[in-house]
């Protein structure tokens, strides 16, 4: 695992986000005839806008990881797959935490179908997700989750 590559992908993967996050992205997607995707905008920023229009001298592995970091994407490298999972783990847990803090939901409102697998607190969920990925990926040519954890993870979205 190349930590520098993982870090470069992680640092660049969300550069193209719009104001108001995914809601802003959906609004721009309706306006532009060719659509709008923040991951494509992130690549555009690092390839064309940085350094006065010269772009950054990034490897294809970094650009591929930035472009394919969404859960539906398929990064070509293990490092890109690590960032893809890390991004979604953070995103889902932040959304749950924000919803609880805002009083929209309570921790006990989360479906038992998912929390019985992942855990009933943010700390438990993070621990389960990270350990599952490490255990399922150790000595294998891919980064992956077990079926039951992946089911619960996708359900929490």
Describe each model-derived feature in a short phrase.
Residues 1-4, 36-157:
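Histidine-centered, transition-metal-coordinating active-site segments
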Residues 1-37, 43-46:
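Acidic/His-rich, divalent-metal-binding segments that scaffold phosphate/diphosphate chemistry
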């Amino acid at each position: 695992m190349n930590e520098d590559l993982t870090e470069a992908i992680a640092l660049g993967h969300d550069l193209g986000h719009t104001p108001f996050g995914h809601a802003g992205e959906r609004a721009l997607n309706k306006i532009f005839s060719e659509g709008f995707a923040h991951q494509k905008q992130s690549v555009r920023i690092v390839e064309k806008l940085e350094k006065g229009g010269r772009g950054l001298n990034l490897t294809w592995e970094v650009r591929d990881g930035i472009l394919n970091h969404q859960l539906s994407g398929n990064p070509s490298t293990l490092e890109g797959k690590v960032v893809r999972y890390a991004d979604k783990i953070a995103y889902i847990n932040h959304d749950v935490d924000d919803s609880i803090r805002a009083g929209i939901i309570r921790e006990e409102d989360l479906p038992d179908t998912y929390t019985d697998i992942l855990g009933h607190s943010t700390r438990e969920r993070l621990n389960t997700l990270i350990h599952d990925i490490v255990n399922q990926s150790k000595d294998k040519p891919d980064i992956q989750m077990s079926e039951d954890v992946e089911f619960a993870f996708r359900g929490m979205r």
